[in-house]
Amino acid sequence: MARSMKLACVALVICMVVIAPMAEAALSCGTVSADMAPCVTYLQAPNNASPPPPCCAGVKKLLAAATTTPDRQAACNCLKSAAGSIPKLNTNNAAALPGKCGVSIPYKISTSTNCNTVRF
């Protein structure tokens, strides 16, 4: 009986160690990309362009979904990666996007952002 309790405890600890990191960051890059997809044309547009309403809806949805520090860091890393893959990215528009959508995020959307410093 004592041996089976030890095995059960060991199994529980192993499950906690394996599952905990997966639960930390609930946001995937797929989710971030889907929310931000309507913004690509704005991010490639000349300065002073206005983001389309579906873009701002995606920005607000992403902000609402990023409720923890790991979520915000995951979103930041996904945005940083996406910014690096958009041809002809207008970095001024990328940096201005949250403000133009009426929200505030604690970092600049840029390929040089240090996402490890992002906190909730």
From Swiss-Prot:
Keywords of this entry: Allergen, Antibiotic, Antimicrobial, Disulfide bond, Fungicide, Lipid transport, Signal, Transport
Reported tissue expression: Expressed in roots, stem, leaves and tendrils of the mature plant.
One annotated GO biological process: killing of cells of another organism
Signal peptide start and end residues: 1-25
CDD domains for this protein: nsLTP1
Propeptide: 120
GO molecular function: lipid binding
Pfam family of the protein (one): Tryp_alpha_amyl
Disulfide bonds, paired cysteine numbers: 29-78, 39-55, 56-101, 76-115
Family the entry assigns: Belongs to the plant LTP family.
Role noted for this protein: Plant non-specific lipid-transfer proteins transfer phospholipids as well as galactolipids across membranes. May play a role in wax or cutin deposition in the cell walls of expanding epidermal cells and certain secretory tissues. Binds saturated and unsaturated lipids, jasmonic acid and lysolipids. Has weak antibacterial activity against A.tumefaciens A281, C.michiganensis VKM Ac-1144 and P.syringae VKM B-1546.
Annotated protein name in UniProt: Non-specific lipid-transfer protein 1
Organism: Pisum sativum
Lineage of producing organism: Eukaryota, Viridiplantae, Streptophyta, Embryophyta, Tracheophyta
